[in-house]
């Protein structure tokens, strides 16, 4: 039997303005996905959003939904001490992790952060963790935007070691996601694991992954988002409530639980 595990393909039109090569690859990916529709016997999609993608591509076989298997023990490794010390300095840290790419909409994160910094907390920092490979023009445009609007402390880490990623998470006070295309969005789960309050724009699979954890935004309004950031960061009771909801959602992604379900699906449909 032929089995497919599907993680999604970024719509090429989202990448086209900044990375034509990546857009072409994604376009080819969609064509190949359609060609495989009648070649596989069973599919696992890591979100309902991804399942619907397969159905749109013409897949008639059985498709089950199972979240990504995440090795949470990796996140308990020691963070990079110098970087943690650098960012754990009393400055409020807003974080987003994910490759620098136009579908991730880091420009909207910077916009909301800039208003938060201007109107609520000048002692704040934005840490954008992720490699910009292929999207250097997009990164440069965002850097110019921050400079023109006098937004201070916007950090593009570039590609960094895993221990340094852990340090960024450990130092973070709030996770802000404005991405417009995610097949699952592992960083949401990572932020929940590190007990960082999450605000995320409700696009693609984002709402599905976040569940009842975190705060979902149904529209992009930078000023309202900045006010919400301030409210969450100042209200310890609200923070505790959000983190409690996130912890509850996190249980659904427990490694043993997902692994057991994966093996069960294979036994039922493949073996």
Residue positions per predicted region:
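Nucleotide-activated donor-binding/catalytic signature segment of Leloir-type glycosyltransferases, i.e.
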Residues: 139-163
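Glycosyltransferase donor-sugar binding loop
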Residues: 125-140, 158
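Conserved acidic donor-binding segment of nucleotide-sugar-dependent glycosyltransferases
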Residues: 215-222, 231-236
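Donor nucleotide-sugar binding/catalytic pocket of nucleotide-sugar-dependent glycosyltransferases
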Residues: 37-78
